Design a protein with these regions (language model features):
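Short, charged, surface-exposed hinge/linker loops at domain edges
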Residues: 1-8, 37, 41-114
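Short aromatic-glycine-(Arg/Gly/Cys) micro-motifs in beta-strand/loop hairpins
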Residues: 7-26
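Intrinsically disordered, low-complexity segments enriched in small/polar residues
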Residues: 16, 29-31, 67, 82
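Compositionally biased, intrinsically disordered low-complexity regions
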Residues: 20, 33-35, 86
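Short acidic, gly/pro-rich beta-turn/loop elements at beta-sheet edges
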Residues: 21-23, 32, 55
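A short, exposed loop/beta-hairpin motif centered on an aromatic-Gly-Thr core
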Residues: 25-38
Length: 114
């Protein structure tokens, strides 16, 4: 079975108790760190783990495994988006059994809250 997954995710960067938090709003997953890059790296690891689990479980509508983040975070994202966004790509390794992965990557829109 061939598998292609490509979608745009929404990442919100904000601070909680002095720690930088990266929040994938579509999957309601978070990563944290001392700075933005560490938080994003931790979040990307969580996103990859969810994708690996989904594909190995043959659940190909990955976003149905997760709940979306609460509306207050989407509001923070929309507010932060007014200050500008960055777009990045998160590649997912093609060596995922039991399917042939034709394409698997995410583009994420990154907005930083004030």
């Amino acid at each position: 079975m061939d598998f292609t997954f490509s979608t745009q995710l929404h990442y919100l960067i904000h601070s909680v108790d002095g720690e930088c938090v990266a929040h994938c709003l579509d999957m309601d997953l978070v990563g944290s760190g001392e700075n933005e890059e560490q938080a994003i790296a931790q979040l990307n690891t969580a996103v990859r783990a969810l994708v690996y689990f989904a594909i190995k479980s043959k659940v190909f509508d990955i976003l149905t495994l997760c709940k979306s983040a609460p509306s207050r975070y989407w509001e923070m994202f929309q507010e932060a988006r007014q200050r500008g966004i960055r777009t990045r790509t998160l590649e997912i390794s093609p060596e995922i059994a039991p399917v042939t992965v034709s394409e698997c990557h995410f583009t994420y829109v990154l907005a930083v809250a004030a």
